[in-house]
C-alpha cells in the first residue's frame, strides 16, 4: 500500500495530459483494459480519447467490436443516417453479441454523443469502427444486401452469393462450420477469398459517399479472416493469432482510407 501511495498517479485531467504528452507523435495509440465493462475505466478511456482527438489530431476510434455493429455508431456520429434518436438507441439496436455492459452502456453512449457533436461542423469527421472478426454471417449479409441493391456490381454480387451459399448449411452458427471444417474438410476458403479479391479489384467502381467503398471491402475482409479463425479454432491454438492479425490488417486498411 505504501508503494502504491508513493508511486501511483490519480487519473485526473492534469495527469491525462501527461499521458498525451508522452504519446508524442505516435500514429496509433492502444488503450488496453484490465476488464471489460468497468465504468470507471470506460470513462477514463473516453476522456483520454477526447484529448487525443482534440489535442493530437487523431482521426478515428477502432474498438474490439464487430464491424457491422460499429458502423451504426459511425453513421450516427457522422450524420450519415438516423438509425436512432439518441446514441443509446443506436447502441441498443446495434450490439447484440455481448451483454449491454460491453458496448451498449452509458459511458459509450455519452462518448458517442460527444463525438457526434464534435463532428457537426467538421469537414473531416472522426470515425468509429470495429476491428474484430466475429461477425462472419452479419458481414456476409451486409455485403450481399448492398450488392443486391446495386446490380451494376454483378460480378461481385455473384461472388457474394457463392460465399453466402457455402455458409448457409451451418445455420448461422460458426461453431458448426468449425466442426465441419475440422472433421469433414468442408471449407469456404476459396469463396470468401474470391469475394474479397473481386471487391478489391473493383474498388474504383465504388463510391466514397458515406464510406460505401470502405464498408463493403471491410465486411468482405471480416468474412475472409473469420472463416480462417473459425476453421482453425477446433484444431489449432493459432486461431488467436489469426484474430490478432485481422485486427492489425483492419487498422492498416483504416489508416490507408484516412
Predicted regions and their residues:
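Structured catalytic-domain cores with a bias toward divalent-metal coordination
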Residues: 1-258
Amino acid at each position: 500500500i505504501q508503494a502504491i501511495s508513493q508511486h501511483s498517479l490519480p487519473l485526473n485531467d492534469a495527469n491525462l495530459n501527461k499521458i498525451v504528452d508522452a504519446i508524442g507523435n505516435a500514429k496509433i495509440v492502444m488503450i488496453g483494459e484490465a476488464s471489460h465493462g468497468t465504468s470507471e475505466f470506460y470513462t477514463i478511456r473516453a476522456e483520454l480519447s477526447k484529448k487525443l482527438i482534440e489535442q493530437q489530431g487523431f482521426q478515428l476510434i477502432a474498438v474490439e467490436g464487430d464491424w457491422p455493429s460499429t458502423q451504426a455508431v459511425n453513421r450516427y456520429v457522422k450524420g450519415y443516417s438516423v438509425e436512432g434518436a439518441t446514441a443509446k438507441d443506436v447502441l441498443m439496436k446495434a450490439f447484440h453479441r455481448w451483454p449491454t455492459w460491453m458496448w451498449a452502456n452509458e459511458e459509450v453512449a455519452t462518448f458517442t454523443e460527444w463525438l457526434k457533436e464534435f463532428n457537426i461542423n467538421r469537414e473531416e469527421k472522426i470515425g468509429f469502427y470495429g476491428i474484430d472478426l466475429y461477425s462472419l454471417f452479419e458481414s456476409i449479409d451486409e455485403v450481399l444486401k448492398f450488392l443486391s441493391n446495386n446490380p451494376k456490381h454483378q460480378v461481385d454480387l455473384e461472388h457474394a452469393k457463392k460465399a453466402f451459399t457455402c455458409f448457409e448449411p451451418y445455420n448461422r452458427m460458426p461453431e458448426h462450420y468449425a466442426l465441419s471444417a475440422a472433421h469433414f474438410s468442408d471449407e469456404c476458403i476459396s469463396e470468401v477469398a474470391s469475394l474479397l479479391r473481386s471487391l478489391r479489384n473493383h474498388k474504383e467502381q465504388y463510391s466514397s459517399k458515406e464510406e460505401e467503398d470502405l464498408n463493403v471491402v471491410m465486411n468482405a475482409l471480416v468474412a475472409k479472416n473469420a472463416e480462417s479463425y473459425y476453421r482453425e479454432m477446433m484444431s489449432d491454438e493459432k486461431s488467436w493469432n489469426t484474430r490478432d492479425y485481422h485486427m492489425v490488417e483492419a487498422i492498416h486498411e483504416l489508416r490507408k482510407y484516412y
